[in-house]
């Protein structure tokens, strides 16, 4: 199966400018292609992973990737299907975020070896050297206002208002494609389906300015089986940066994917062969309660993003927390597994008697409730049940002299911080 048809089989091709021509180009030749990443945050997230992994698949098939960091466009802000205008960031912030994105991309694309090793470019390099007058004369004249207004991403913002800054974004992205086509013979741009209007601005500019042929391929914006935008956990983005979303949190995210989505996501987010995925599908449908598809997803993606060691740590944290074995984990692992649970910083004047501390730290609302919970065996300190109403937190309860973990009932965790 050629690479284009495999991408289609995996559900990774949403729209193309000319499917037959693109398939032929990928089958018969060596294609240089690019994907752009604007530094709109200090990390990429799961939403970016579809395009990143598609880029990697093409590289493995022998084609050459260019990764464009939008040092210039990141200063402007893409209006595509955004309800309101993005807040403008400082140059220093955009540079810092761009550097972090570079580091993350190197985890997925091969930048060091091979004839088709990836190349990193920054559009600030060419936009910083072109004057506004030259840009209007040499680029702007190829775009009619009617053409620009026809883009769906612009139409959706006309009613609420769109600044000229954001309106001009599509020309900037189009010029990126032109520059890469002219200087590196890049003939294919890959991006999310919400980028279609900006991306085809590039093919139009290449056609009109240099009479060249170029292609666009969009990957789908992933939604779950309920239609909800994929890539968020509890309303928050799932980041590729371990400091923003821990490997454990990412592991849990994939483990909790709905049955209806699991096999589809294996095709999109893993490098398992289609035959391997089909075998998993058969086993999964025979015994969905064993969650083979979700466990495989979690293993493959966490290992891909964070490495095998981080994956094994995430599994261990999951197993130990499920068993209530708090002492079997390091403080570092506990902080991963219990990120997001209520934390209380113990003050020097706090009474460390269990009844008082349960109220002070917010575990319960009253001393009466605290006494009832302790008496009924509902309170655990570092995994050990406490039923002594006079129990006082001691140095022995401070894990690595830093935290104490309280559990109320089966699942409600609280962390006491002593630092």
From Swiss-Prot:
It catalyses: tRNA(Tyr) + L-tyrosine + ATP = L-tyrosyl-tRNA(Tyr) + AMP + diphosphate + H(+). Catalyzes the attachment of tyrosine to tRNA(Tyr) in a two-step reaction: tyrosine is first activated by ATP to form Tyr-AMP and then transferred to the acceptor end of tRNA(Tyr). The keyword rRNA-binding does not apply. It comes from Streptococcus agalactiae serotype Ia (strain ATCC 27591 / A909 / CDC SS700). Residues 352-419 form the S4 RNA-binding domain. L-tyrosine binds at residues 34, 169, 173. PROSITE patterns: AA_TRNA_LIGASE_I (PS00178), S4 (PS50889). It comes from the Bacteria. One of its GO terms (biological process) is tyrosyl-tRNA aminoacylation. Belongs to the class-I aminoacyl-tRNA synthetase family. TyrS type 1 subfamily. InterPro entries: aa-tRNA-synth_I_CS, aa-tRNA-synth_Ic, Rossmann-like_a/b/a_fold, S4_RNA-bd, S4_RNA-bd_sf, SYY-like_C, Tyr-tRNA-ligase, Tyr-tRNA-ligase_bac-type. Transmembrane segments: none annotated. GO terms for cellular component: cytosol. Homodimer. The keyword Phosphoprotein does not apply. A motif ('KMSKS' region) lies at residues 229-233. GO terms for molecular function: ATP binding; RNA binding; tyrosine-tRNA ligase activity. A motif ('HIGH' region) lies at residues 39-48. Its EC number is 6.1.1.1. This is Tyrosine--tRNA ligase.
């Amino acid at each position: 199966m050629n690479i284009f048809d495999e991408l289609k089989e995996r559900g990774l091709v949403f729209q193309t400018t000319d499917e037959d021509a693109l398939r032929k180009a990928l089958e018969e030749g060596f294609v240089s292609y690019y994907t752009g990443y604007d530094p709109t945050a200090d990390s990429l997230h799961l939403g970016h992973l579809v395009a990143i992994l598609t880029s990697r698949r093409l590289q493995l098939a022998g084609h050459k990737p260019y990764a464009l960091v939008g040092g210039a466009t990141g200063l402007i802000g893409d209006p595509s299907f955004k309800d309101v205008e993005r807040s403008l960031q400082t140059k220093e912030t955009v540079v810092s975020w761009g550097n972090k994105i570079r580091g993350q991309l190197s985890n997925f694309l091969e930048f060091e070896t091979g004839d088709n090793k990836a190349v990193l470019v920054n559009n600030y390099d060419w936009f910083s050297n072109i004057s506004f007058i030259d840009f209007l004369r040499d680029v702007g004249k190829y775009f009619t206002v009617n053409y620009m207004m026809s883009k769906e991403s612009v139409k959706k913002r006309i009613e609420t208002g769109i600044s000229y800054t954001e309106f001009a974004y599509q020309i900037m992205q189009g010029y990126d494609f032109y520059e890469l086509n002219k200087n590196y013979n890049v003939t294919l741009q890959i991006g999310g389906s919400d980028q279609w209007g900006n991306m085809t601005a590039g093919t139009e500019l290449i056609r009109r300015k240099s009479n060249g042929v170029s292609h666009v391929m969009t990957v789908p914006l992933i939604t779950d089986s309920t239609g909800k935008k994929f890539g968020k956990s509890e309303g928050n983005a799932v980041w590729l940066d371990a400091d923003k979303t821990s490997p454990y949190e990412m592991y849990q995210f994939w483990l909790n994917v709905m049955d209806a989505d699991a096999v589809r996501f294996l095709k999109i987010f893993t490098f398992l062969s289609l035959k391997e995925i089909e075998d998993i599908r058969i086993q999964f449908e025979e015994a969905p309660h064993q969650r083979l598809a979700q466990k495989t997803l979690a293993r493959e993606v966490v290992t891909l993003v964070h490495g095998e060691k981080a994956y094994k740590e995430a599994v261990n944290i999951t197993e130990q927390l499920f068993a209530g074995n708090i002492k079997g984990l390091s403080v570092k692992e506990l902080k991963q597994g219990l990120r997001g649970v209520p934390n209380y910083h113990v003050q020097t004047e706090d009474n460390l008697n269990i009844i008082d501390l349960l109220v002070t730290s917010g575990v319960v609302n009253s001393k009466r409730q605290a006494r009832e919970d302790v008496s009924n065996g509902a309170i655990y300190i570092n995994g050990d049940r406490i039923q002594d109403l006079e129990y006082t937190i001691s140095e022995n309860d401070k894990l690595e002299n830093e935290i104490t973990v309280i559990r109320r009932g089966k699942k409600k965790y609280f962390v006491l911080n002593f630092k």
